[in-house]
Curated annotation (Swiss-Prot):
Record carries keyword RNA-binding: no
Descriptive protein name: Large ribosomal subunit protein bL32
Protein family: Belongs to the bacterial ribosomal protein bL32 family.
One GO MF term: structural constituent of ribosome
Biased composition (Basic residues): 49-59
Membrane-spanning residues: none
Annotated NCBIfam families: rpmF_bact (TIGR01031)
Species this protein is from: Neisseria meningitidis serogroup A / serotype 4A (strain DSM 15465 / Z2491)
One Gene Ontology term, aspect cellular component: large ribosomal subunit
Length: 59
């Protein structure tokens, strides 16, 4: 098992963890229906950029 040679200082520890923060996912609003969805993904009702691209089961 790997064992460190020297103790990592608090500064270096913080730098190591600097990319671990969680961010909220970006959301877009569909211009025609007002549905909220992730950017570059279809909305839950099957619309993408104002066009119907997927037939949803409930319709």
């Amino acid at each position: 098992m790997a064992v460190q040679q020297n103790k990592k200082s608090p500064s270096k520890r913080g730098m190591h963890r600097s990319h671990d923060a969680l961010t909220a996912p970006a959301l877009s609003v569909d211009s025609t229906t007002g549905e909220v969805h992730r950017p570059h993904h279809i909305s839950p009702n099957g619309m993408y950029r104002g066009r119907k691209v997927v037939k949803v089961k409930g319709e």
